[in-house]
Amino acid sequence: MDPYKVIIRPLVTEKAVSLIERENKLTFIVDRRATKQDIKRAVEEMFNVKVAKVNTLVTMKGEKKAYVKLKPEYDASEIAARLGLF
């Protein structure tokens, strides 16, 4: 799957911001058909980082949400700043 079609948008909520600061995790709304491997590949390619782990869930609205944990040598707050989240 094309990386630019996998990630629909970053999610900016109070919980998402606290995850960036505390756990080095980014939160995205992604395509429902995307697998964890697709999401990992897309984030690594788009932001030039290494991903440690991806957790996904489908919300009550029917959107797929992905929590992407970055490896310790990368900073989620730096990526969030590049995206304009802060």
UniProtKB/Swiss-Prot annotation:
It holds the Pfam family Ribosomal_L23. GO terms for biological process: translation. One of its GO terms (molecular function) is structural constituent of ribosome. Keywords: Ribonucleoprotein, Ribosomal protein, RNA-binding, rRNA-binding. InterPro entries: Nucleotide-bd_a/b_plait_sf, Ribosomal_uL23, Ribosomal_uL23-like, Ribosomal_uL23/eL15/eS24_sf, Ribosomal_uL23_CS. PANTHER family: 60S RIBOSOMAL PROTEIN L23A. Binds to 23S rRNA. One of the proteins that surrounds the polypeptide exit tunnel on the outside of the ribosome. Part of the 50S ribosomal subunit. Contacts protein L29. Belongs to the universal ribosomal protein uL23 family. This is Large ribosomal subunit protein uL23. It comes from Thermococcus kodakarensis (strain ATCC BAA-918 / JCM 12380 / KOD1) (Pyrococcus kodakaraensis (strain KOD1)).
